[in-house]
Amino acid sequence: MAAPAVKSASTPKKATAQFLWEAKTKSGESKKGEMEAMDVEAVNARLKSLGLNPVKVRKKSMLDGDITIPGFGGVEGKDILVFTRQFATMIDAGLPLVQCLDILASQMDNPSFKKVLFAIKSKVEQGSTFADALKEHPKVFDELYVQLCAAGEVGGILDAILNRLAAYREKNEKLKSKVKSAMTYPIIVILVAIGVTAVLLLKVTPVFEKMFADFGSELPGPTQMIVNFSHMAQEYFFHVAGSIVAVVMSFTWSYRQPRGRKFWDKVFLFMPVFGPVLRKVAVARFTRTLGTMISSGVPILDALDVTAKTAGNRTVEDAIIYVRGKIAEGKNIAGPLAETKVFPSMVVQMIGVGEATGAMDTMLNKIADFYDDEVDAAINSLTAMIEPVLMVFLGGVVGGFLIGMYLPIFSLAGAIQ
């Protein structure tokens, strides 16, 4: 007869919580941070084991979290870039990791980033690795950052890795800034044109129409056309505005769905005018990310995993995942890259040469530098092409309206003479 089952321990494992603490060192210096523990007693015991005298310990509440409005008060790319540069310099100078984090957190102006850095410092003080502490803040430090720091810690070259990361982020921020500025200008001009047209049709035209009605004469064709457009705009304004909002919301919803994002990312990548610029940006980002990771000692399969996640375009991401699968099967990188038909043949050939000569990281970084310049040239060319078109469009809208509105006045003046 089987023995009765032994009853499992009746007391479940107690859940941990986040605690905020303040303490003093033996020299009287004040310290503060955040710690995960079972209770206040556990925090006090841990602080004493670190040579600190606890002053105040309390459980972290929801009110202690960062309350931020999207686009305001968050951690920006330039904040991370400056932190990485300074951190690399301090590590290179031989300062202990915890001291570096303490100094940088204390000097940080951004309150959100300050809290993150103090939390990371607290984790490291508790015995966590720097990379594991970073991993708990994925909205600030992406997987690329974490993986490279992990490689730097294992290899004892964290300062060199941080310098590479800083260089990578600096070039990446410049690339993003260029693309953003290129896209922002035409959008602003188009929005201004729409706003001006709306004001002219909804506010200005009715005033002129009332004045023309007093003349009692028939309106010229162009003027009548503008008046008809004004009537339509007034009658269907809310219908049009509602339709625009519905289209924007539908697109946003569609883009957030996996299939929708896959479709739209492919459309963006191969659409006229902007498509070639976006493809160059994708190549620059892919080669820069992969080159930085390989030169830092990250295995090729892990590097491709991270590169796929940071691609920024689903079509490019799927292509990188396909290439990774083929490499896992034992194939080289150039063949599968060519099969995706996403990357230019010149890029594929150069990567193939780099792989054959054992200098793929160097070749990838050279390709990235080349495509950074290509993006510059493409954006300058695009701006030079779009600028006069938009100016002519805006001038045509305003000029056409002015001519249409003043034609009856000129006709009336001619009749009086």
UniProtKB/Swiss-Prot annotation:
Transmembrane stretches, start-end: 141-161, 182-202, 235-255, 390-410
Name of this protein: Type IV pilus assembly protein PilC
Pfam families given in the database record: T2SSF
Family: Belongs to the GSP F family.
Family matches, as InterPro entries: GspF/PilC, T2SS_GspF_dom, T2SS_GspF_sf
Known function: Essential inner membrane component of the type IV pilus (T4P) that plays a role in surface and host cell adhesion, colonization, biofilm maturation, virulence, and twitching, a form of surface-associated motility facilitated by cycles of extension, adhesion, and retraction of T4P fibers. Controls both pilus assembly and disassembly and plays an important role in PilB localization to the complex and ATPase activity.
One GO location term (cellular component): plasma membrane
Keywords associated with the record: Cell inner membrane, Cell membrane, Membrane, Transmembrane, Transmembrane helix
Membrane topology: Multi-pass membrane protein
Coarse class of the protein's main subcellular location: membrane
